[in-house]
Each structure stands twice: as C-alpha cells, then as structure tokens.
Amino acid sequence: MGGGSAIRRVKRNFLQGKPVSTGKKEVCAKTQGTVIVFGEYGVHKSGKGEYELLRKGVTIGIFSEAQIKEDEVLFALSHGVILEVSKGGIKEIITPEKATLLGLIAADGSNMFRREQRLRGSYRTEYSTRFYSDDKELANLFSMLSEEIYGITPHHYNRKKDNLITSVIYNKGIFYDLTDLNIKGGPYEFHVPRDHLNNDGKKAFVKGFFSGDGNVSIAGDKITIRFYSSYKEGLEELRLVLIDLGFHPHEILEYVQPTGIVYCFSVPREEHVKFINEIGSYKPRHVRIFEEYLRKSGYEVEKRDDGS
C-alpha cells in the first residue's frame, strides 16, 4: 500500500493528535541521527527529540513519539489509527481497541445517513453510527471504546419490551471514518478491513464480532463455537481472518429459516481451547460457558489483559 493515503489522512481536519508538523520540507540540519531505514523511507531523531519520517531524503511528517521495533516503526495518528513504516512501505494499521469497536458494529450495528426535507425546500442530513444489544455489558463496552477512540459518548435508548439497548453516535466525521473503511453497507452487510489489521487487530475484530453474532453452546463436556450472519461475503472474509491467525474453520453452511437464509461456520473441536485463549468473547454468557468448558476439560482458566 502506498504512502499517499496515509499522509492525506494525517492532514484531515477530522483527525486529532496529528503530527507536530506535516507537509514536505528539506531535511533539517538539526537532525541528530538516523534511527532506522526501510528502503526509500527513513526515520531520524531531531535535536528536539522529535521523530522525522522521510521519503527519499525529504521530510513528510514529524511526530513527537514513535514505537521502534526491529522490523517496523509505529507512529500514533488519532482515532485508533497507527502509521506503520516497514520494508513494505507505509500503511495505516487499526489499533486493537478500534478493531474491537469495528467488530461490534459489523455484527450488530449500522452506519448510515438520512436526509429530511424541511420547510422552504431545504434539507437536513443526520449521520449516525449505531450498535444494538440486549447485553448491558456490550453496550457499555461500545460506549467505552467510542469515548476512548473518538472522544464521544453515545446516546442510549432502552426498549423495555425486549430489553434492547440502542447506542447511537450522531457524528458526521465518525460516519465518514467508518465509511472509508467500508465496515457497513446495506442491511446486514459488513466487511472486514483486513488490509488495515495486524494480528492483534485481527484477533480484536473477531472477538468484537463474535461477541455480537457468535454462538457457543455446551452439551456435557463438549462445546460448539459458531459464527452466524445473513451476509455470506462478509462471513467468508471473517473466516479468512481466522485462517490468517492459524485456525482451520469449517466451510460455510447455509440454513433456510422463516426469516430468510442464514450462513454459518464453526471452529473445529481441536481448536476450541486455542480460540478461547487467543480470541474469547465479551458476551457474559459466552464467557461463562468458556470457563465451564475449560474447568471440565482440566485447563486452567486464564485472565486476559483486556479483562475478559
């Protein structure tokens, strides 16, 4: 992936916490030394302690902080986006926190706009990003991630007859941010931003999605782990992500139900413990079944860093 898109995103007014300076300029004399070089890209540290990102010797961005690894350098942009510089060039990577949020929305959310005609022929456009759940814990997770990534607290609407909680963010910038990533399309459609996810991001996205549209059942000392969706293309993308992570999910099956066609695939029994330990779920019912299964199978119940 080329560097143009990443640099343009740095410049977008919607982003906050952007680099100290952007735009091309000649290499400053105050540069103290080269930190690392990947092909035509290099990272230098200046006398002010800032990190300069260069392409062919020209500074294209200045950052106050950098995470330097042997095979990559990471710069935090904003709203859950990291700029990754490596031998492959530069590309935008989504943080695990944002990947979790996107997984929740892909499973049980929407991202849309609505135009309403007003008096005298004018129009009003409402932009909204929504998440639907009857689990208070998942609604709270959606709120926490929204606040952490975008700095916005969603509105919550409770439907008493079935305890459905609708969490809504009314924000044009967030709508376009998610539209750029092609997370949601028409009804029931979703896509996985696979090109913007590293392994940690892939695990987080799958966990967010599974918490919404996943199912785990237990019978005796055996469990079944399944992913469901009415949108086969998105489900196949999710299946490919699990393959990227070293899983061997079964092929997608089709079920005809009174409400329409539903697609699903399952995780092989021999990979259940791997799934629980590496992916898991935020849904309380899933967590209880996973813990019961591990105890019955003689495995120690691990406490994950994210609290699940």
Label for each model-derived stretch:
Residues 2-308:
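Internal intein/HINT superfamily modules and their associated LAGLIDADG
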